[in-house]
Amino acid sequence: AYCLTEPDSGSDANSGKTRAVLSEDGKFWKITGQKMWITNGGFADVFTVFAKIDDDKNLSAFIVEKSFGGISLNPEEHKMGIKGSSTRQVFFNDCKVPVENLLSERQNGFKIAVNILNLGRIKLAGAANGGSKMVCSTSVKYANERQQFGRPISKYGAIRYKLGEMATRTFACESAI
C-alpha cells in the first residue's frame, strides 16, 4: 500500500509530519506518524511509507512490512464508489524498520512519490477512456434501437449531434493519453 497522504498535508505532500528516527545502534529506523486514505491498507502486508528524517527538506521512502509491528489501522472508510479496495488510516507507532529498507537515497522519497502518482494518473486516464468508449458504443446501440415517431432516434439531428460530440471527445481523450 502507498502511504503518502496525511492529515493537514493534502496537496502539499512534502509537508508530512511522519518521522523516521535512526536507532542508537544504527540498525533500524523508528517510524512514527499517521497516514490517511490508504488504498488497500486493510489488505496490505507491505507498505511504501514516506517520512522525514531529522530536519530534512524532502521526504524519504521506506519499505515497511506489516510484520515489523508498531502498525495499527482504523476501520474501513465508507465510500460512495471503488468498493473493491480497502481504504483506511494507517498509524505507525515506533515501527522498527531495518536500515536497508530505506528505498533509494535519503530525501529521494518525494521524487518517488510524484512518479508513482503520475503513473496512477496515466492509468486512470486510460480507464476513463475505456469507460467513454463503452458509453459511446452503448449509446449508439440504444439510439438505433429506440423508436420515436416511427423511426430510430439516431435519425434525428439532435441525437446525431450528441453522439458525434461523444465520439469526438472520446477520440480526443484517447489521443491525449
Across the structure, where does each feature detected by a protein language model lie?
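A structural signal for short hydrophobic beta-strand segments in well-ordered beta-sheet cores
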Residues: 18-21
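Short beta-strand or tight-loop elements
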Residues: 14-16, 45, 69, 159
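Short, solvent-exposed loop/turn segments at the edges of secondary structure
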Residues: 13-15, 42-44, 56-57, 85-90, ...
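A short, Trp-centered hydrophobic/proline-enriched beta-strand micro-motif
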Residues: 1-5
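Flexible loop/turn segments at secondary-structure boundaries
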Residues: 9-12, 38-39, 70-71, 99, ...
